[in-house]
Amino acid sequence: MGQTGKKSEKGPVCWRKRVKSEYMRLRQLKRFRRADEVKTMFSSNRQKILERTETLNQEWKQRRIQPVHIMTSVSSLRGTRECSVTSDLDFPAQVIPLKTLNAVASVPIMYSWSPLQQNFMVEDETVLHNIPYMGDEVLDQDGTFIEELIKNYDGKVHGDRECGFINDEIFVELVNALGQYNDDDDDDDGDDPDEREEKQKDLEDNRDDKETCPPRKFPADKIFEAISSMFPDKGTAEELKEKYKELTEQQLPGALPPECTPNIDGPNAKSVQREQSLHSFHTLFCRRCFKYDCFLHPFHATPNTYKRKNTETALDNKPCGPQCYQHLEGAKEFAAALTAERIKTPPKRPGGRRRGRLPNNSSRPSTPTISVLESKDTDSDREAGTETGGENNDKEEEEKKDETSSSSEANSRCQTPIKMKPNIEPPENVEWSGAEASMFRVLIGTYYDNFCAIARLIGTKTCRQVYEFRVKESSIIAPVPTEDVDTPPRKKKRKHRLWAAHCRKIQLKKDGSSNHVYNYQPCDHPRQPCDSSCPCVIAQNFCEKFCQCSSECQNRFPGCRCKAQCNTKQCPCYLAVRECDPDLCLTCGAADHWDSKNVSCKNCSIQRGSKKHLLLAPSDVAGWGIFIKDPVQKNEFISEYCGEIISQDEADRRGKVYDKYMCSFLFNLNNDFVVDATRKGNKIRFANHSVNPNCYAKVMMVNGDHRIGIFAKRAIQTGEELFFDYRYSQADALKYVGIEREMEIP
């Protein structure tokens, strides 16, 4: 028993040594290969340069070149000094005029930065990428600063570990190299040095054969366990095993992944269901900023099932032409039956959205079929969280039983098809391609029974053919809930009075500081009211248009009904420190004249980007400053303060470095995030601090995002430098800003 325990203890240690030894060998081999590649490339480039030089020399020999006359004297030029250049060789002396350059004041120091026009969210840096150079004076005053800085990153510094770098190529080579060892080699430490050298030579002789031939069997688990122990940041042993499988699987050229849907515009387009066609769209598209893979919202809101009224989807009762489907017998009755079925169907809230993923061993049918599994909503967006547990699964099963229709996007399948009145004329036998069928299923969830509009969008089918295809697919397309079911009541004046009072109550709870404002995340609690457990209510935020709650939610912000400029506290939006929403505020002009600068609403400047022209020049106070080109009026929007959006913890780590540089561009956005314009930002970052500023900053809610706006505190003339209050403490103000600009005497 004693020997067995000793051997089991020595096994992992031995494998760790092997991992380190093979890793160092592979790294050294990679460096040698890289050096050989550099030498080969250098020789090749050198040869090309020599060949090109020889070609140019031959061309110059054939050309006639006019000789240059050497100036021997400049005495004829008055007020100039001469400078002669002589040589010990047989070259004549050269005399040229000497011109003196006057001293020029140097420009202020500026660190490199990347220009941005909107905020950019970044992840926290848990590893110190480089140790900043502070100068000898800073280190002499505070010798422990570097040590404390490294402690803030838990001692993780980029490049300080000998075995810190491993990419996919080295990982595969390392696993293959470790696979040469036998399972009986765990007690190599007890062997003689001569025997160990012989084994090492045998391994080196077999490495060439190993590289040419693929491994016969999958590597043992102990190999991945040893690699995981040496590189814990690369994942567990199971994760490394899956990664090795993915990297070593041989893929055929041009083969698509098992979960990939062919391009709808390509020759291999297939007829697939709506959720499969829109899976990438729902996964990558951000519904808050209307971009793919946006860099501002890590959480993508799920599509709101409460549909707005849209004139594009309104059904036109007039036929589009003599061949319109409405001339067919039974067409109008069929459309009326669809509308009646939609009105009968109440809107159901989905039980929760998760990122849909198809199993590897299954594929969706090319033709629609009725299936209980397909009624599950798979075209999900990025999830806010993952629910686990038996209780949650029971709830999901109960919700699945209740759900017969998914949402307004018609992602589910209905088992009660609508019967069509038989037509006198037989339907046309038209073949639909996979792309056309998939496009029809995508559009039917938006345009419903507006077959003329769907035909115009498809482009290759008439509205009659679209209508007949819709009748054919009636058994698998669910009736969509009508948009009139959730229409709010018409008593808007009383509702807005209550909301104005509600806004004042919320505003009284906040003192205007960004430290008491929390970041907004859309709430998503199906069939649950927005009570004390709602995340929006907990954070004292209003429910926005991105939330999944009902439009009758008591915490939902309704917008304003102003007919003025929305620049006083009489406007609910202005009172709540938020810009007017063009989707909610329909009477103040926020939704009108989007391309025009003459907008009646003055509370939508940040979202429109109505910034002023700013000029960058040396400041009269310190370093660089920003100046206004055109005059602005009091309370007029000047620019948005843009930069990287980082967490409060990351801001604390960066701030300690910025304090030593005595230069900081950190700006509190809310209680969760900070805007840092040090590395990325716009020109307003150069606005200096003043206790008597001509601008002020205000954090506003703009379409669900907190953004920082810089406004004029008074009327500013052309060419004035912009200042705003950094809200320094008295000690910090004396420490960082020792110069105050001179006040102009009127």
From Swiss-Prot:
What Pfam families does the record tag this protein with? Answer: Ezh2_MCSS, EZH2_WD-Binding, PRC2_HTH_1, preSET_CXC, SET
PROSITE patterns listed in its UniProt record: CXC, SET
User: How this protein is processed and modified after translation, per its record?
Assistant: Phosphorylated by AKT1. Phosphorylation by AKT1 reduces methyltransferase activity. Phosphorylation at Thr-345 by CDK1 and CDK2 promotes maintenance of H3K27me3 levels at EZH2-target loci, thus leading to epigenetic gene silencing. Sumoylated.
Which sequence ranges form a coiled-coil region, renumbered to this chain? none
Q: Which residues carry this modification: Phosphothreonine?
A: T339, T345, T367, T487
> Which GO BP terms sit in this record?
B cell differentiation; cardiac muscle hypertrophy in response to stress; cellular response to hydrogen peroxide; cellular response to trichostatin A; cerebellar cortex development; DNA methylation-dependent constitutive heterochromatin formation; epidermal cell differentiation; facultative heterochromatin formation
Q: Which InterPro entries match?
A: CXC_dom, EZH1/2-like, EZH1/2_MCSS, EZH1/EZH2, EZH2_SET, PRC2_HTH_1, Pre-SET_CXC, SANT/Myb
Which locations, inside or outside the cell, does it occupy?
Answer: Nucleus; Chromosome
Q: Which residues carry this modification: Phosphoserine?
A: S21, S76, S363, S366
Q: Which residue intervals define the domain CXC in the entry?
A: 503-605
Q: In which tissues is it expressed?
A: Present in actively dividing cells. Widely expressed in early embryos. In later embryogenesis, expression restricted to central and peripheral nervous system, liver and thymus. In adult, highest expression in spleen, testis and placenta. Lower levels in intestine, muscle and ovary and very low levels in brain and liver. No expression in heart, thyroid gland, lung and kidney.
Q: Where is this region: Disordered?
A: 180-217, 340-426
The gene coding this protein: Ezh2
Cite the residue spans of the region called Interaction with CDYL: 329-522
UniProt name for this protein: Histone-lysine N-methyltransferase EZH2
Q: What induces it?
A: Repressed by the microRNA (miRNA) miR-26a.
Q: Where is the composition biased (Basic and acidic residues)?
A: 196-217, 374-385
- So what EC number does this one have? 2.1.1.356
> Bias regions of kind Basic residues — which residues?
345-357
The UniProt entry lists the main location of this chain as nucleus
UniProt note: phenotype after gene disruption: Death early in development. Embryos cease development following implantation or initiate but fail to complete gastrulation.
UniProt function note? Polycomb group (PcG) protein. Catalytic subunit of the PRC2/EED-EZH2 complex, which methylates (H3K9me) and 'Lys-27' (H3K27me) of histone H3, leading to transcriptional repression of the affected target gene. Able to mono-, di- and trimethylate 'Lys-27' of histone H3 to form H3K27me1, H3K27me2 and H3K27me3, respectively. Displays a preference for substrates with less methylation, loses activity when progressively more methyl groups are incorporated into H3K27, H3K27me0 > H3K27me1 > H3K27me2.
GO molecular function terms attached to this record = chromatin binding; chromatin DNA binding; DNA binding; histone binding; histone H3K27 methyltransferase activity; histone H3K27 trimethyltransferase activity; histone methyltransferase activity; lncRNA binding
The protein's recorded glycosylation sites are S75
